[in-house]
Amino acid sequence: PSKGYIANENFDLLKQAKYYVDNGISAFSILTEEEYFKGDNEFIKIIRENFPNIPILRKDFIYTPFQVAHTKFLGASAILLIVRMLDDKTLHHLHSLAQDLELDVLVEVHDEEDLKRALKIPKLDILGINNRNLDTFEVDISNTKKLIDKIPYSLKEILTIVSESGFLTKKDLE
């Protein structure tokens, strides 16, 4: 999305979703933010109806309890919380609320300061390390390794860590 719209006016949501399913995806990541990313809450409902057994991450700027509850109502399985967007009290509250609603929570960090804050969240279990610099929009996939090295070993053993952004080809993942 930082390089323009992902889809054009001919975008067929179900056709694209089926392509992903046929190629073995483990979960959908659905943009619902409308203004900047042209997402739509209806995308989650459509995907849930057609692929009821595949987890769905709602990608949006989540900053209120209502949005967390609405995510559950829409049929998503998980939310994204961007550490940089939230003060610690709100971050912890939304994380706890989501877990109470049986939603998984992908907590996204971009740098060492974000990471320090994220690691203080009680019951943190999924950590996303975004390789995109939010100030310059440049991508450096080595950011994941740099930040993983800052995580205590005892936490690495229990966290699911997701490397986000900057992967264009299979070779990038290797």
Where are these regions (language model features)?
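Active-site-proximal loop->helix
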Residues: K45, H70-L74, H93-L97
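A short, acidic, amphipathic alpha-helical segment used as a generic capping/interface helix at domain edges
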Residues: T144-I151, L168-E174
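Mobile, glycine- and charge-enriched loop segments
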Residues: R48, P152-Y153
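Glycine-rich beta-to-alpha active-site loop
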Residues: D60-Y63, F73
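Glycine-rich phosphate-binding active-site loops on the catalytic face of alpha/beta enzymes
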Residues: S26, I30, H70-T90, G128-T136
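Short amphipathic alpha-helical segments and helix-helix/interface helices
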Residues: A17, I44, L91-H95, I148, ...
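A short, conserved beta-to-alpha structural element at the edge of catalytic cores
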Residues: L86-S96, D114
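Conserved N-terminal beta1-alpha1 strand-loop-helix module at the mouth
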Residues: P1-I56, Y63-F66, L97-I126, L134-T144, ...
